[in-house]
């Protein structure tokens, strides 16, 4: 067993050694399931306590209290495992956590008393927004979290107490599924599913992050974003399918208690019906992609259908936190200057059309209309347009149907307000979709710095930008769900 631990440690070191600042699509070949340390028995209920070792393939575990991984320890979960989390239990990660599901044998982390529902979804009637089990909370001593091919269902129960001493942003009462705060660590979430959250799916205060090829449904009750990295976090959010979010699908912000710029490549995502459940002031600035508070982002090749707002580059209320990263060049940054384009929009009413290029509702914006977008908003608004100005987008309603394989567009009135899950719909593109072949593969590169690439202890592959807009590519690459 010690030999297995040594081998695993060596693999972990190899994973970090494979990091680089270059670009391109790094892919690793799948390897057989591994075991770290001793096997964890599934006989009886696992009480709150410290755990390390391996949950074995295909077994079902029931958990009644917080699973804590101590600093220096590793918990590995093999393919096909189901973990039934009761009593609002969490994973408290001070060491390393590795979940290695596969496409044919995914892992499931769930609240066993809750069941998924299809059709119209509303807060107060759908338990997806209430939080069943808690989340995965990672402290500053957690160096590596790898989550692959895993269903995370009904998470987000409120933290009952502060799980560790934090210098970042976690506090009792938080309701995230994923939380990470080690600026030197790596967090990998790939090829997985998230169903139901009451608040943000993920909150990062530092770290090297790869969020890729996931499907996210019913996220945020009356507030909350999908993926929400804060200051000093860097990485990629790409090839994700995000439907039915309360606020934004993806957001970046150089704020919080972690110093440094937040920098992300945000590309080839599909956003559908996002931004309608946040009715507060922040609801007037939500919908698909939000870049704010001096964060830097590369936002390309995204397909945005029936969302409350298009890609939004925020200024700040009353001149505070004025956004400079799109006008200030910095050669030392991973992203030298914020840039965006080649994004595809479809809208079903005038209110959406009036915010394809967001206006200064709630706070000033500095989003420039782009000629490479579909529709061509630079041509539509004209050379005299000043960012933030109100305009009439009514003539854009119903144009550029992306031609999903199976989804009603034009949508029935109000359908975007309550259809918050995939159900039996298929968001792949038909062969004659106007979104095929309209993306860019050369205008930008993904971030690779600090992201390990390894079949077990890192990313399975940083997928390069795709030529088709959205997360599903006509050549079969991209999101595999």
Map each language-model feature to its residues.
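Positively charged n-region of N-terminal signal peptides that target proteins for export
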Residues: 1-4, 20-21
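Active-site-surrounding "flap" and adjacent substrate/cofactor-binding loops of secreted or lumenal enzymes
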Residues: 92-106
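C-terminal motif of bacterial Sec signal peptides marking the signal peptidase cleavage site
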Residues: 15-18
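Extracellular beta-rich repeat passengers
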Residues: 23-59, 63-70, 74-75, 88-95, ...
């Amino acid at each position: 067993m010690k030999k297995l631990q040594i081998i695993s440690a060596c693999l972990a070191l190899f994973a970090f050694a494979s990091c680089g600042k270059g670009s391109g699509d790094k892919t690793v070949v799948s390897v057989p399931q591994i075991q770290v340390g001793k096997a964890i028995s599934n006989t009886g209920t696992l009480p709150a306590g410290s755990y390390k070792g391996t949950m074995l393939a295909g077994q079902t575990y029931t958990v009644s209290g917080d699973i804590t991984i101590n600093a220096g320890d590793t918990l590995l979960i093999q393919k096909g495992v189901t973990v039934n989390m009761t009593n609002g239990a969490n994973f408290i990660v001070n060491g390393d956590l590795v979940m290695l599901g596969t496409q044919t044998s995914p892992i499931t982390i769930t609240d066993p008393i809750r069941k998924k529902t299809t059709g119209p979804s509303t807060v107060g009637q759908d338990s997806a927004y209430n939080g069943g089990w808690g989340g995965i909370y990672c402290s500053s001593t957690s160096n590596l979290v790898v989550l692959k091919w895993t269903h995370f269902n009904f998470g987000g129960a409120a933290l009952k107490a502060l799980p560790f001493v934090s210098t970042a942003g976690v506090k009792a009462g938080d309701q995230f599924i994923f939380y990470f705060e080690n600026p030197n660590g790596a967090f990998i979430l790939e090829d997985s599913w998230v169903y139901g959250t009451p608040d943000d799916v993920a909150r990062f205060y530092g770290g090297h992050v790869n969020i890729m090829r996931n499907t996210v449904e019913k996220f945020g009750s009356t507030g909350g974003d999908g993926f929400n990295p804060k200051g000093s976090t860097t990485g990629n959010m790409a090839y994700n399918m995000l439907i039915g979010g309360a606020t934004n699908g993806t957001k970046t912000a150089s704020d919080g208690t972690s110093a440094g710029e937040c920098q992300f490549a945000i590309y080839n995502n599909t956003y559908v019906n996002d931004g309608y459940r946040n009715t507060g002031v922040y609801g007037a600035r939500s919908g698909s992609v939000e870049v704010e508070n001096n964060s830097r982002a590369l936002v390309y090749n995204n397909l945005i259908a029936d969302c409350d707002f298009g890609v939004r580059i925020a200024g700040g209320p009353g001149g505070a936190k004025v956004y400079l990263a799109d006008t200030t060049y910095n050669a030392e940054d991973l992203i030298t200057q914020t840039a965006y384009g080649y994004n595809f929009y479809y809208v079903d009413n005038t209110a959406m059309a009036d915010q394809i290029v967001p206006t200064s509702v709630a706070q000033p914006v500095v989003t420039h209309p782009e000629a490479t977008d579909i529709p061509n908003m630079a041509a539509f608004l004209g050379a005299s347009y000043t960012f933030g100005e109100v305009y009439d987008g009514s003539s854009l309603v119903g144009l550029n149907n992306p031609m999903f394989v199976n989804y009603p567009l034009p949508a029935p009135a109000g359908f975007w307000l309550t259809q918050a899950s995939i159900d039996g719909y298929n968001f792949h593109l038909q062969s004659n979709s106007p979104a095929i072949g309209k993306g860019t593969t050369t205008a930008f590169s993904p971030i690779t710095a600090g992201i390990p690439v390894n079949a077990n202890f890192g990313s399975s592959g940083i997928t390069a930008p795709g030529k088709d807009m959205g997360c599903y590519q006509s050549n079969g690459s991209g999101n595999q769900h």
